[in-house]
């Protein structure tokens, strides 16, 4: 597998793997561009229902942005490429699952927080050394951290540079589930499969509403339109019929 972002799919589930294990899966600018292309493909293909994001190997999810690949000084980061990718990932109209296969460091924490779910191995840990190198993090990333982990845990991670490990990450809400390394793929697949089995109009629509609510920018009119669309959809009729017949529904996204 070549270095960079490797994209694969299995039915309704797609996986993007950060493949730079020799560099702790640190992200180059080209990798961030590649993640945009992945999201372009996922958005264009409605048969893809869930996107899994992970890192290659079994030690590190990602060490964040490769600082050796950063140039241009502070002004060049007014439009922070990592923040732009994370914002888009957060709003992607598909369910996203971060497969946490080890350490999540620096900006990779923000990337993982932009996913809807995080499922990790028991070796999972996060650490953000921003305060140790004099860096002020993006408000959008701090908002995501507060929303997922709560204010106090976010303070510990960003102000004290504490390393939080799997059990604590589960307690504060960062990890939805954690398990042994040998069972990680099965745990991730269970979440991805559950997400993929829901009615597309319902899942994608409610994800959009939840994202807007978390950002404090709900488009109430658009949300009401999505609700009306769901009530009138073939999928809702199919869902009710499936319940009555005691079978699995066959949703078409319409």
What positions do the PLM features span?
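Glycine- (often His-adjacent) and acidic-residue-rich active-site loop
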Residues: 55-88
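Conserved CoA-thioester-binding segment of acyl-CoA-metabolizing enzymes
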Residues: 1-54
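Acidic, divalent-metal-coordinating active-site segment for phosphoryl/phosphodiester hydrolysis
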Residues: 162-168
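Glycine-rich beta-to-alpha active-site loop
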Residues: 88-137
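Hydrophobic, secondary-structure "cap" segments at the distal end of domains
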Residues: 143-152
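C-terminal long alpha-helix characteristic of the crotonase
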Residues: 119-124, 175-221, 228, 251-254
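Well-ordered beta-strand positions
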Residues: 111, 117, 156, 160-162, ...
